[in-house]
Amino acid sequence: MTWTPWYHHRALQRLEAELSLTTGLAIEIEDFEKATPSSYRLHGITIREPETTHEIARIRKIEHVTEGGEVTILLQQPEIQAAELKGIWQLLHQRFLCRPDLTAMPVRVSANDLTLHSRTGAVTLKDVDAWIVPHENAVEATLACLPANSLNDTPINIMVRRDRSGKRPATRWSLDTRGTTLPCSAIADFLPEMEKLGVNAEFAGTMTWQIEKNHWWIDLGGSRFTNVALDRIFERNSHRLSGTATFEFDRCRIDPHSKRSDISGSIIAKNGQMGRSLLIAANQNCGFEVRLQDRLIDQHGDIPFDLLGLGFNVNNAQINLTGICRNEVGYEGFPTDVALCLDGFPIVFSTPQTLDSLSVLNVVAPNYSVAVPMSDQTDWLMNILIPPSRPMPTNQPRIRSANNWHGGPTISQPQ
């Protein structure tokens, strides 16, 4: 039998059709070689979303070998469009991880210089290795990689586990950066929430989340977000807050379906500004004490600050907020509970009382919000701050002073 150009082209078309049918994607291949019955090479691969035809990925060469009951795949210079990751993940999740017949054989995938393109730029990953390992009632996919500019030799680890042992199958993700920082902007197209942290925000630590039908939870315990732009977080809020912040989570388990929030951590922000309306809201709803310097009382506009330090502890509908400025270097001589300072002077003090979630929601809610402050500005908080199912007992009444405060009444009767 002679291998003619016509037959080669026909075989290439058949291969494209088979791969497209299996993956649910539009696969285009410039050329291929079949060296042995158990191996082949693909050249110039382009992967597209089948409905929009948007490019998802481009790969210079793929080497595929099946041997000893295991599949080995080598990708040469793959480039992925981050904007298409969310849709492609959902498709591959349903097509592969949810189908035991397609994950019955172990698979190892290696890639050199994987580039992830996003709206904010490109991130290149090196030493990329992935494994798909089937188990009796589950399948695990593990990815290890390093950012090309990383000084750390320990790879980032990502694991996806599809567990079928329970009453309902569930998919669990886990991410461990193992000392390496990841730019949040690289996955902002995949997780839009990351875009709200700013283009310079970075993540380090561990993250685990599980997805079931109509149920999800996430655990960020041990994680840290740095270089967070507070003005991006508050850009759709009626109050103003700016500065560069670091968020650290000692514990952080959020489970909206079970109405559970167990969060403990801190926020440290420097060189920013806080709107006067936000100060008033913190005073009226959380009992924070405001002591403005004389020169700031007569000025208009936002209040500048050198340091914002706040510890938080969320237990479902109960919240404790504690000023922690004195924990920072150079501020050790400050009194306890200082949450905001300027030019070496404390200007905001936290309250020791336990707050309910509605009090904190009312701080960031617009002035026109109703008793349960649901709005575009607070929607993202409703999964974190669980509204109480009944009125919570109040702490013993106490009056906190607001010396030199001319921004409005510190105590008012309900209208």
Give names to the regions the model predicted.
Residues 2-84:
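Terminal hydrophobic membrane-targeting helix
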Residues 83-91:
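Extended, regular secondary-structure scaffolds
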